[in-house]
Amino acid sequence: RQQYPIITDEKIASYLSELGDRLVAAAPTELKQPVYEYSFTPVNLKEINAFALPGGPMFVHRGMIEAADEEGQVAGVMAHELSHVLLRHGTANMTKAQNPWLQLGQIAGAVGGAVVGGGAGYAITQGSELGVGAALLRYSRDYEKQADLLGAQIMAHAGYDPRSLARMFETIEREAKNSGGEGPQWLSDHPNPGNRTQYITEEATKLTIASPPDTSEFNAAKKAFAAMPAAKSMSELAKSKRGSGR
């Protein structure tokens, strides 16, 4: 087993938590579950990826933040993931799974302490990406469009232009093309419903965007990453662990 590399830098962790809390505060009250414990954890991996588990824990790869040109793009992906949680898409997938409790157990076991607060690192099965490919976290195109539209509304209420989400999707898809088809894990779990940029842009024109937040901490996080050693990919991490005999 290897450790999922959580970023423990207090400033980066605090920044991501504050951004996540801002998005939760902007979400529709009627969709919030009082029993959910929302958390937002930065992960030191270079893949452009982010995902949320049923119940609220969200994980954002360093590569997602580094690929973003501005905070609104990161906020957009996080709002999209938060929308899956609020709309209970993972729970709905669980009811469709052949063995739903096994699926949930695999993911809960992979995340370990994350569901209940966790520590500095989470044990995961080597070669898997925290079970992100599991049925619970692989969404249909209908679910994707719902999360896009609700995510756009959350963004606007939090002070971000939803078109930033569309631009981030374009960045993710461009990365997929540049990698020769072996693109970000995020794309395989979040299929494009079609006309994504168009309908997000149309939704943005209908929404009133609140006063924009101070985004200086986004730039500070990017500078902090630039001063750190480059993040490894999941495959590179697995190879280094095998090489060290761990």
What would you call each of these model-derived segments?
Residues 1-246:
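A Zn2+-metalloprotease active-site environment signal
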